[in-house]
From Swiss-Prot:
Subunit structure: Heterodimer of LeuC and LeuD.
Enzyme Commission number: 4.2.1.33
One Pfam entry name: Aconitase
Protein name: 3-isopropylmalate dehydratase large subunit
Amino acid sequence: MANTLFDKIWDAHVVQKVEEGPTQLYIDRLYCHEVTSPQAFAGLRARGVKVFRPDHVYCMPDHNTPTHDQDKPIEDPVSKTQVDTLAKNAKDFGLAHFGMMDKRNGIIHVVGPERGLTLPGMTIVCGDSHTSTHGAMGAVAFGIGTSEVEMVLASQCILQSRPKTMRITIDGELGKGVTAKDMALYMMSKMTTSGATGFFVEYAGSAVRNLSMEGRLTLCNLSIEMGARGGMVAPDEVTFEYIKGREHAPKGVDWDKAVSHWKTLKSDDDAVFDKEIRFDAADIQPMITYGTNPGMGMGITEHIPVDDKSASFKKSLDYMGFQPGESLLGKKIDYVFLGACTNGRIEDFRAFTSLVRGKKKADHVTAWLVPGSWMVDAQIREEGLDKILEEAGFAIRQPGCSACLAMNDDKIPAGKYSVSTSNRNFEGRQGPGARTLLASPLVAAAAAVTGVITDPRELI
């Protein structure tokens, strides 16, 4: 019987199927951060239960960590409590913990792949919706709730209903200035934020195959924003080259055995998906959002739609201060944020730096450039990107989720416009009253140096 990549990994991890109910699925890796794990550990204590497979669990703070002065105590009491509680829980239960200032620390969805903890064929969960990021490595990865975190801690298994399968094929070549982020925003603009609800998505096609590992991670990161349970890309030589030599990757003979197995992790030629969607890469241009959900996006040279008369559409535009039919080109912006688990990797910093090289940041723009991890930070400095950025008027902050969400010091003031490389533009996501425009690192860089929304292709 022909199987999809998802089927192969899912079926290999089934412990038992509950009759007319969910599947008991074995989990290879559980990642925990400080926000969704405290109640799970409290539940274990209340029941007197130990962690079943402590060697399969990795903990690190990221949401609440400040992006400056990390060597000092966190000032916000709530943030400090959450970060300290995670450290205590990890110690008490004997779990790996990458705390602040630990050079292994960073955003959990950046650290997992770069440390070789996330590997093809794995099942991976975390109490975070953007766990789908790890699917780029050829894994079945998805976000779970706190009660489910407790379930995995206690048993290394989870009860899940099997999602349907979808394949999104993107063929052709991306044009100048078009990135994986633009691919994702384009898909969402066509499919809406509910277009993949109930499905696990496999991305395929020549445009996907030609993406770097970082690009694939960005693509899978945004799967949840289409309503998908998760997203994945079949592993190939790009994947293997990325993993080889990383800290937790297999070594020697084990590496050869692993790669041999990983090469079998692909959908069979005659595998049948529940739904198939196709896009042409040539139709995609640099994208930007204009509303208050990630599906409200358009090509940067396009105009805000005029045919949507719904109350929710009007409410969204009122919040953003925009009008139907308006072009965003030349619109003054106030903040630029480069970072998040969507675009906080080395390739994103290279792209941003390539555009601002030899230019200067607009005086009125506040720019937060936040590496996704200390490893990314080190590579930025090894490649001399920090010097180029400093000459252009930018500074590198310390790793963390930062302005992706208003849960730490990096908040956008009310009414201000932020061109952000993160993944969500909901009302108040970056701060009460903040107006978020999601975009790629290149679009963010163009806005940072011109002070207005600019087509990056004009500056490349």
